[in-house]
Each structure stands twice: as structure tokens, then as C-alpha cells.
Amino acid sequence: MNRRFQLLTIFVLLVSLLSAQNNKVEKQQRLTGRANISGKTVDYTTDEVMSQVAVQLFALPDSSFVYGVTTDDGGWFNIKKLNVGKYYLRMSFLGYQTQDVNLEIVKDDREKPIGVIKMQDDAIMLSEAVIQEALPPTQMVEDTLMYNVDAFKVPDGSVLEDLVKRLPGVEIDENGAIKVNGQTVTRILVDGQEYFGNDQNMAMKNIPVNIIDRIKTYRRKSDFTRITGVEDGEEETVLDLRVKKNMHKGWLSNYDAALGYPVGENDFSEWLKALYSGRVTLNRFQANTQFSMNANTNNSGRGGGVRKNTQLGVNFSKNIGEPYPRRRNEFPLVVGGNIRWNGSSSRSLSESESETFTTEYTSSSFRNNRSRSNNENNSVSGDGRIEWRPDTSLTIVFRPSFSVSRSNSSSRSGSVTFNTDPYQATDMRDILNEYMNLPAEILDSIGVNSQNSANSNDNNSNQISGNFQISKRFNKERNSNGRNLSVDMSFSKNGGESISRSATKQEYYQRHDRDTIMNRYNVNPTDNSNMSGRIMWTEPFDSGRTSLSLSYQIQASKRETNRQTYVLPVTGDYEFWDQHWYVPSELQQYLNGELSRQATNVTRNHTISMTLRRNTEKINFQMGLNILPQYTGMDNFKYMGYEIGDTSRVVVNYTPSISFRYRWTRQKSLRINMNSRTSQPSMEQMMDITDDSNPLNISKGNPGLLPTLNNSLSLEFSNYIEESRQTINLNMSLSNTLRSISNKTDYDPETGVSLTQPMNMDGFWTNWNTNGNFSYQKTFKNTKYRMSASTNASFRHQEAYMRTGSIGNYNESAGTGGAAVLSTTETVSAGQRASFTYRDNEWVELTVNGNINFNHNENSVRKDGNMDTYNFSYGGRVNVTLPWKNAHIASDINMSSRRGYSGSYNRDDLIWNASASMSFFRGNSGTLRIEYFDILNDESNVNRSVSATGRSDTRNYNINSYIMVHFIY
């Protein structure tokens, strides 16, 4: 009780101190006159209101800065308490001419309306010519980073994905995940409206670049925060596309058809003879209505293996009624939603070389593996949104969603494990193809085991969910930080069935008496349901600048599983793989009760929160304290022959949170966040039972596991210097886990079998990491030159226990026969990326770039190993526009190198791509484009992963070299 009282006392003192400091800052900025000015900004051509326009007030005659604001959602701005004198207002926004308005405040002025200021495009008409200054590629406004699309040259007919890859500070990984200055993008919007929910591929692969005017990226607040004005800490990074004004007038259609073929040898020639892609988009973007229909199909997507994809989708949104006065984005009724179908089939091939760290480095485990897999997926999903505002004080939001999916997959793999590095002990270079040719005495000396396996899975799942929110404001003024009552409820229900088959054949070179063949068939039906509810009351103080929120939330879930495992016979003379897919008609007689699992898992989490907020012109501060009673229970647990009755656990956690933001100007700000989160180990982890379904990787539960506490601290700084057109972003974070759960590993060097058991690590810094990202962009004064650079660095500390020796009877205890040794792995990573671009108006764009990434890994057990890796590349890109038929020629070439990897993975890849296009028809509406990727057929894909117990290098085989011919209309 004393500890809780101390926390509460510190909480109140800190908030009181900050509140006093905020009042001090506010007085320094407060104007002391009696005149108020107001105005509104709109687009000169369309008369649409413009939000986030920078409004700066300067005093005459010395042009000293007095005050600055930005326009609200309705385009309005207000500056209060001006002194008598002469001033001028300056309105500025990316892509528009700066507007200056002179004004004079005299003694009797109280309210002085400026009127409507019309913002013109950043172009000046002289006779029949247009002189247009090139716009800066990036600009910061508040927390929003904006990209001017015209500053980035892409081939005609390109889609959003082609453009985003070239934006400074943006990275797209092999899975399509987008990061902007280290922040992961979770949603794409069009003119502020959701576009196909969280399915980013619908936007990335379908929206043509030629309709986009600007891309904004910012942290979008949750529905709860947007309708209540109360921060709940739930934000997501989004890309918001602004459509060109002349594209708002009617229907927009775009068609793209392409054919091609792979060049050179590849590992998928039997399945893929030719390449194709097709895309049809139909869009209508208006002020209050959006409609999109997309269809595309292709088998030329780059990534792991080869993939055939087909997508169909419809998206719509509609604002009904007139917006409420001075609330541009608040309509009486807003409806929207989407439905989409995704179908794909893929083939993949990968190889890996891994090392498991053991307590004696001379007997480390080295494993080579090759796997091939096939996957088929089909899904239909959709979500909707209904937002109803009977008046300005009441908002009701309902979001339903559903999904139905069917998938099947199959894979085959082969592996071999050695007790020493095979590249040093033998002359082999293609281990998996050559190890069987080794003399028996050598294989029995350095070989540990080999495994061949085949797996297949058939899955189906159905899901339905909904979220309902209602918020009542008791203060109808524009400031939403008033008294507020809100209720939030959600539910979800999903179920399905998974049928899997697995067959494995193990040979142990040191213990041939343990050679085994296993053939198993699993049926696993699931039924899950979740419900949650939250109620929050917010009470304002000090004219709404300070508020106190009290909330209660309950979350309940129930998961039912009933996995049935059948051990199929392995007898007689047969070809192992031929019988793998055979399922006996009398399946029930092979049911194995020891390997089957039946359980009902129930959780109930309660959250009681108190949050104090303080908002001023420059400072936003929030401090909260959460009390979380948590219940977890498992009923009717049956597994591996054990029958366990009701098992439950109750834990109460206390987690603080602090959020601080300081804003010097609308373009310069600092944000600091600290959060703590608790998590419970799963009930499966806590059960003292052993699972040997994979004979080489056996797992065992630990009933003594304790909950973990994760602490995170993050810092974000952003600044845009308008005079020199420089953008600076800095992100830093520190995270650690108290009582973190790591796997204790027992490794048997005779058989290569590993037994893992989860356990809590002691100490505050047993598992922690820190990272930082700094990015810089600059456009030079004549706007022909621009540069961008980014630096990232990270450190990670991981701990786990390991033991080498005979495992013995693992059903009785894990790790018997010797003491475990602490294995610590520390990883330092650093990277630098830079590019320089020259653009001569619309004719030539030339870019040179380079990057280097370094990873240093040290392990306390494997002290003699060099695990440093280097990845570096350098090259350039050129785009040339010719006056004849709007012809474009583009080419890029990069040398990509790897060092420090296993075997043949160290290599230099010279990657050269080229494309050419020309336009036809009226208005250049038709485009013919030819593309040649990886002309030298030299690209390869390799990555490394490191943990506290081992490292692994993996190579994925792809079709990288191919030609495509497009016709786009």
C-alpha cells in the first residue's frame, strides 16, 4: 500500500510542476492587446477549404515575427489580443503561392475579420507560357511529412508502389511492409478517406501515379480519440494521398496489360513458362463521394519464389448532408466500406546454413537445410463504417468486418547436421548434394543426423467482428477537450479447422539404434470468441487545457481447441514419399490419446485507468496510471496422456505511462513517450508436459513461469527549415523486458536433438535493445539539386541458458546430467544510406546512391567465431524524357555485395535494370513500355538472423531476370 501511495504522490507532484511550467511558458507567448483577427483560406480554383495552412503574423516595419497558427479543418484561423500597430499576415502551403495581407490595428478595433484568402497554385501565367518554380520534394507541417509527387520522376503508367520506393526516408521490405523514417505504415488513405481498410496492396498495386498530387504521412489517431478528443495512445502511421484537383471532375479509368518471359536459367521453369500482368482500375474521387473498383492479376511479382496473384475489390465512402459549421470533416452521416477477394498460388525454394551455439565451441552444431513449398490461398473479406452525428455533441460509430479464407500448402525438406564446420572439415561445397558421397567412416565421425520430411496443411477459417462507439460531448464548442462521456464495445467470433499431415525420417550417425520414421495426421478444430467494453469519463479544468480521465475496461476471451493426432503405421517395403499422402479408411483406430490435445482457455482482463492531461500552445503532456487485474484459466486440459482439471492464475499489475510533446513552431517539435506493458505466459508454456512430435526439436513446459514487464522509452524530433528547404527527422528508442522469457536449451551432441524449456531470466537488463534513426533531406536553392541521407544504429542484448550433454529421460526433467551455461549474444548494427539527385526541369533526372550495413555479433559461448557481416551497394539511376511522342528512357545499375556470410553466400551482384516507353493517342493517353529486370541475371537474396542460441543464413531463390512489355491506357 505504501508503494502505491508513493507512486500516486509522485504522479500528482510531477503534473503540478509541469502545469506551473506550462503556465509560465504560456504567459511568455500571450499577446496583451484587445483586437482579434480571423479569416479563412480556400483553394482559388475549386473554393475548397484548406486546412493546415501556415499563418504567420509579422510586425511592420521591421518584419519581426509576432505569432503563428495553422488553419483548422474548416480552413479558419484566429489570432487574439493583438496590440495597436501595423502588421502583415503571410499564408503558405506546399504547392501554393505565398499570400501576404497587410492590416492595421487601431485603438477601437475589437473584432477584425480578414475575410476569405484564396490560395493559388504555385505557377504564374505569362502570356501563353507557364513559368513554374520546382517545388521542394518534402516539407514538414506539424507532425505531417509531405512529399510533392512532381519532384520524383517515375516512368509513365507507374503505380503507387513504384513511386513510394523512391521517396526519401521510405523503405519497403520483401514482404511489402512500408516504413517511413523507421515507422511502419499500417493504412493508406485517399483525400483523408480510408482506401480498402488495412489492405495496403490494393492501393500500392492499383492507384496510378498520374492522379496523385501529394503524399502525406503522419500518425493518425484512433476513432476513439478523433470523436472524443481524449488521447488513448493508440495511433497508426498512414500514407494519405491527395488526388489532383482536375481529377475530381468525373470517372477515372486506367488499364494495363503486359506479357513477358523469364531470361536465363531458374528453378521454377517447369511451373512458370511465361509472365503476365493485367490491371483495371475505375475511380471517382469527389469532395463527398469516393468510389473505386480494382482488378489485377499477375505472376511477375518479385519476392520469395514465384507467385500468381489475383485481386478484385470495391471501395466506397459517402458523406451525407452538409458539414456542421466550422467542422469541415464532421457530417451528419458518413458511410463507407469495401469488399475484396484475394487469390494466390506460390512456389518457393530456400536453403539455409545455421549454427547452434553449444557450451563447448569445438562441438558446435552445424546444419544445412533445403526446403521447397507450394501454397494456395483464397479469401473474401470486407469491412464497413457508419458514423452518425445527430448533432455536434453526439457521435455514434459502428465498424463491422468479416473474412472467409481457404488455404492449402505442402512442403518437402532435407537437412543434415554436423558436429564441426563441414566446409573446413571436408572439400564439399554443395553440402546437401555431396554429403551422401562421403566415406561411411567420415560421415559417422562428423555427421550427427539427417532428416527428410514432408508436410501438408489444409486450413479454413471464418471470422466476424464489430466495434461500436458512442461519445457524448457536454461542451458544444469547437474545443473538444471538454466534459465527455464515451462508451466503446467490440466483439469478434472466429472458427475453423486445420488438417495437417507430417512424415519425417531421421537417421542418427552416432546412434543408429535411434533411427526413426514417423507418419502423423492431425485434425485441429478451433472456436474463439472475444468481447470487450470500455467506459470513460473526462472532466476538464482550466478552460479545457487540463483534463482528468477515469476509465474502466473489461476484456474477455474464450478459446476452444480439440486437436486429434493419429499415428499412422509405417511398415513393409515401400517408397517413403509415396505412402506419405495415404490416409487409411479406418482412421479412428490410429488415434493417439497421448499426442491429442483438448482444452478450453478463458481470460478476463480488467483495466482501471486514471490519466491527467495538460495541453497548451507549445506543450502537450499526459501521465497515466493503470491497474490491471488479470485472470487466465484452462479447463479440461488433456495432452500427451495427462488430464489436468481447472488451472487458473490471477495477477495484478501496475503500469505507468508518460507522453510529452514540445512544439517550438508548426514545423519543429519533440515528442517523448514512456510505456510499460505486462504480458502473461501462455497456459501451454506453463504446463509441465513434453511434446516430442518433432524428434529433433522437443519442447517442455514450465509451471513456475512469472509474468513479464516490458518497458519502452522513445524520442522523436522533427524539423523543417523552410528557408533552406531542409527536413530533419530523429527517432530513438530503448526497450527492456523484466523477467523476460527465454528458452533453456539442452543439446545432445550424439543425436543433434534439442530439448527446450521456457524460463524467466533474472535481472533488469537480461534482454534489452536500443535503436536510432536519423534522416536528412535538402533541396538546394535552384531546386535542380537535392540530397537525402539516413543513418541507423541499433544494439541488442539477448540471454538464454544452454547445456551440452545427454538429455536422458526428458519426461522427468529437462536438462539433467549437468549445469546449464548462460549464453549471451550481443548484436551491434549500423547502416548509412545516401543519394544525390540532379533534375534539369522535365528532361533529365540523374541520381547516384550508396548504402552500407554492418552487423557485429558476439556470443559468450562461441568466443572464437567471426559473425560480422557487411552488406554494401552503390550505383545510380537516370531518367531521360525526349520530345518525340513523350518518350522516356530509364535505367539503374547497382553493385550489391555481401561479406561475412556462410560458404557461397559471399558474393558481388551487379544488378542492372532498364525501361523505355513512348506515348500515343490524344493527350498521350496510351503508353507502350518495355522493361528488362536484372539484365545480367546476377541478383541473389540472402539474409542472416541471430539469437542467443544460434545464427542462420538463408537464401531464397527467385526469378529476378525477366522482360515485360506493357500497354497502358
PLM ranges: what are they?
Residues I37, T45-L60, T138-M140:
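Short, ordered, surface-exposed loop/turn motifs in non-cytosolic proteins
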Residues M50, N78-K86, L94:
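Short Pro-Gly-centered beta-turn/loop motif in secreted/extracellular proteins
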Residues F58-S64, K86-N102:
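A short, solvent-exposed loop/turn motif at the edges and junctions
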Residues L60-W76:
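Short, acidic Ser/Thr/Gly-rich low-complexity loop/linker segments typical of extracellular
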Residues S64, N198, K221-K273, N288-Y969:
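Primarily recognizes Gram-negative and organellar outer-membrane beta-barrels
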